[in-house]
Amino acid sequence: MKKTMINQTHIEGILYEHDLQAKVSGDTSKNPGTPFITGTISIATDDAMTNIVPVHFTYVTATFGSGKPNDTYTTLNNIVNGTFGSYMKDGADKAVKLRVDSALGLNEFYTDRNGKEELVSAKRNEGGFVHKVDTLDEDEKVRNTFKADMIINCVTHYDPTISNFYIIHIISHSNMDSLGFDTLY
């Protein structure tokens, strides 16, 4: 079975908006009093500013555990303090161009819906490396890409001629070995 799975996103564009906040970790944290940045940046990947891709950062500190400076923190801090502008706040001319290399992740939490606790698993771009760039790729199609190893075990097909949805099981546990996959139990 494959030992490492590919999970990469590449996002280039103009900083559209953000809700980043500079905070300090509390007394009960592993490293109390540590400054960190949390929040979301939204990147416009097309020139028309219609394809907006959010990237969430949970906990970004100024240095790595090794003590080496964290360039992502520096970039995010420049966004927080206004050194780098955003399209919505400062206009297109002052909005910073960014490249983000991230990964897909899950934001899982429980919510109370109609008196019943329910698990919500929302997919999002989580963290990664953020760099200020001077130019963007001319081809808008390559500004927002992802590579991921995945197994599709079910798809829903809609046939408008019969107005019904039906489910097609593509890969099941019983036939994965015949396709060259190790069984994932």
PLM features per residue range, with description:
Residues 1-185:
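OB-fold and OB-like single-stranded nucleic-acid-recognition modules
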